[in-house]
From Swiss-Prot:
Binding positions (thiamine diphosphate): H74, G115, H116, S117, G147, A148, N175, Y286, E367
Annotated cofactor note: Binds 1 Mg(2+) ion per subunit.
Function: Catalyzes the acyloin condensation reaction between C atoms 2 and 3 of pyruvate and glyceraldehyde 3-phosphate to yield 1-deoxy-D-xylulose-5-phosphate (DXP).
One GO cellular component, as annotated: cytosol
GO MF assignments: 1-deoxy-D-xylulose-5-phosphate synthase activity; magnesium ion binding; thiamine pyrophosphate binding
Organism for this UniProt entry: Heliobacterium modesticaldum (strain ATCC 51547 / Ice1)
Keywords (A to Z) from UniProt: Isoprene biosynthesis, Magnesium, Metal-binding, Thiamine biosynthesis, Thiamine pyrophosphate, Transferase
KW Transferase (keyword) present: yes
Protein name: 1-deoxy-D-xylulose-5-phosphate synthase
Subunit structure, interactors included: Homodimer.
């Protein structure tokens, strides 16, 4: 099946292959990617669309001397296969296996880590500046999709790169034809002329000859320039890039390997910033992915023959419950509007968009704009719900502070993927939102213990007259019955789920269920553990927490979030401010990035399990009962098995 691919240990091996063998290699690459993602899940459609493009890049350029930066990184699988990682490709996105995104620690060919969108052009310009300052050689290439090009940072980088004028190449992988649709003989001919260095040399020679014509030379040049500009505006879709200072080449058929090689070869001979516009088809070579590219953009395990995604039977996902509840509430209140940043499917906003198209705003990959715009919507009496992944909300931090909270604009943040998300790894885990949101004045933040509480919290958020966030995890709910009638949750009120006199376990969000399981384990040992569902990160239920601290003298906090600045830190701050002496242990994520792997495996690795919570509570209950001071657990003397402070 992989007679050629299995022999590729580095990009240089491609030079020995004939055109026929390269075509066969492209087929083998597609087959390996399809088979692997069908088992492991992953970004299938983007990678199938860049097979020929990636081959052309590695045939023309010499990685890693020539630096190729993959924007977002969704489309880096082909690159990984061509850079000596074929034998490990079966571990893609598996725990301690190959990452699903470029990773510098994985290969010298991965020159810049990516995972979030629109960063490649900035990185490429930085590499170009460094190369020129150090008087080194080597090309720099950024590969960016038309979707990622909507990101503000990408446009900022284009503006700077065009002004700076350093040699670099931006490959625009246009797989939705959102910029142009003019592929054909004329565009191919124009591209060949404009990518040939002789065009630039002849252009300069002609200009010099005309300039020497007595009296009228300069005038003729101006007329010629106007004619050229008019012609370019008529037939060349890249005039925007040329106005920014780039030489525009394209559009190019992204599945014609020989044409891609020719254009890339000519592009690397040109001076200054170059933009190569390549048209590709997402999902190329696999029928189901070509038909439904959005479904197969990021997909779980699926049946290769039928293309059907393997769905796990069970409770609805938190995203689905959010989606259904929002739709239900929006039918009752026409002031509710939905906002997302290029993630309508992932955030569950698609049903809302279909039901209320005039009340739905997909702003593209522009989180800052989404939040800023939502503040204005809220100040005009509407009820904007910004549905966004936790990791992507980081991009709009200043807007949350400056445009929403400072004005106390009643914007609802539906923060999806709060916590460990699994196989996409460190760039996608939502482990920092509590820390970067809870210290902003005026912002209320809550997290439901289950899917039923989520729907009540969404109603609460939409009735609250100020900025408010609801944080919920990826994946299925716990399987509780969903109430028909939606009620509001009192702001800042937690819930005592279980009485106990020996120790109190205070948990937030999805960790509440684990805390209850831990209490069951402790009860079997004769240890009476109280369990508190905090519900609110901010404001905390001061009365309940202080009461429990004084009654039991011991608190264990549990959060699926970093310990630094997190929920446990908020509890410690509260106890210190109120002068309450209580032994405290915090369980959460330490000061490190969490790698990729299944949610269950990673929770086990970091001690976010009932058995570990019970162990920590047991040790605390058996320890010195003195309440003279708030104590922290000592750091682990060996490699952390349960990577919280609670080792």
């Amino acid at each position: 099946m992989t007679q050629i691919l299995s022999r590729i240990s580095n990009p240089g091996d491609l030079q020995r292959l004939s055109a026929t063998e390269l075509d066969q290699l492209a087929k083998e690459i597609r087959e390996v990617i399809i088979q692997t993602t069908s088992k492991n899940g992953g970004h299938l459609a983007p990678n199938l669309g860049v097979v020929e493009l990636t081959l052309a890049l590695h045939l023309v350029f010499q990685s890693p001397k020539d630096k190729i930066i993959w924007d977002v990184g969704h489309q880096s699988y082909v690159h990984k296969l061509l850079t000596g990682r074929y034998n490990h490709f079966h571990t893609l996105r598996r725990y301690k296996g190959m990452a699903g995104f470029p990773k510098r620690s994985e290969s010298e060919h991965d020159v810049f880590n990516t995972g979030h969108s629109s960063t490649s052009i900035s990185a490429a310009l930085g590499f170009a500046f460094a190369r020129d300052l150090k008087k080194e050689d080597g090309a720099v290439i950024a590969v960016i999709g038309d979707g990622a090009l909507t990101g503000g940072i990408a446009l900022e980088a284009l503006n700077h790169a065009g002004h700076a004028g350093n040699d670099m190449i931006v490959v625009l992988n246009d797989n939705e034809k959102s910029i142009a649709d003019n592929v054909g003989a004329m565009s191919t001919y124009l591209s060949r002329i404009r990518t040939d260095p002789r065009y630039f040399r002849n252009k300069e020679e002609v200009e010099e000859i005309v300039r020497r014509i007595p009296s009228i030379g300069n005038h003729v040049l101006k007329v010629m320039e106007k004619m050229k500009d008019s012609f370019k505006h008529l037939v060349v879709p890249g005039i925007l890039f040329e106005e920014l200072g780039f030489s525009y080449l394209g559009p190019i058929d992204g599945h014609n390997l020989s044409q891609l090689r020719e254009v890339m070869t000519n592009a690397c001979r040109l001076k200054g910033p170059i933009l190569v516009h390549v048209l590709t088809k997402k999902g190329k070579g696999y029928g189901p992915a070509e038909t439904n590219p959005s479904v197969f953009h990021g997909v779980g395990p699926f049946d290769v023959e039928t293309g059907k995604v393997k769905k796990h039977l069970g409770p609805p996902t938190y995203t689905q419950v959010f989606s259904d509840t929002l739709l239900r509430l929006a039918r009752e209140d026409e002031r509710i509007v939905g906002v997302t940043a290029a993630m309508p499917d992932g955030t569950g906003m698609t049903p809302f968009a279909r039901a209320f198209p005039s009340r739905f705003f997909d702003v593209g990959i522009a989180e800052q704009h989404a939040v800023n715009m939502s503040a204005a919507l809220a100040l005009q009496g509407l009820k904007p719900v910004v549905a966004i992944y936790s990791t992507f909300l980081q991009r709009a931090y200043d807007q949350v502070f400056h445009d929403v909270c400072l004005q106390r604009a009643p914007v609802v943040f539906a923060i999806d993927r709060g916590g460990i998300v699994g196989d996409d790894g460190e760039t996608h885990h939502g482990l920092f939102d509590i820390a970067f949101l809870r210290h902003i004045p005026e912002l209320v933040m809550m997290a439901p213990k289950d899917e039923n509480e989520l729907q009540h919290m969404l109603r609460t958020a939409l009735e609250y007259e100020g900025p408010i966030a609801v944080r919920y995890p990826r994946g299925t709910g716990v399987g509780v019955t969903l109430d028909e009638e939606l009620t509001t949750v009192p702001i800042g009120r937690g819930e005592l789920l279980r009485q106990g006199s020996d120790v109190t376990i205070v948990a937030i969000g999805a960790m509440v269920g684990i805390a209850e399981e831990a209490a069951d384990l402790l009860e079997a040992e004769g240890i009476r553990a109280a369990v508190v569902n905090a519900r609110f990160v901010k404001p905390l239920d001061k009365e309940l927490i202080i009461k429990q601290a004084r009654e039991t003298g011991r608190i264990v906090t549990v959060e699926e979030h970093v310990l630094a600045g997190g929920f446990g830190s908020a509890i410690l701050e509260l106890l210190e401010m109120e002068g309450v002496h209580c032994a405290v242990r915090r369980i959460g994520i330490p000061d490190e990035y969490v790698q990729h792997g299944s949610v269950s495996v990673l929770r086990e690795d970091y001690g976010l399990t009932a058995s570990n919570v019970a162990r920590v509570a047991r040790e605390l209950a058996d320890a010195d009962r003195s309440r003279a001071s708030i104590r922290m657990a000592p750091p682990a003397p060996i490699k952390i098995a349960f990577r919280g402070e609670s080792r």
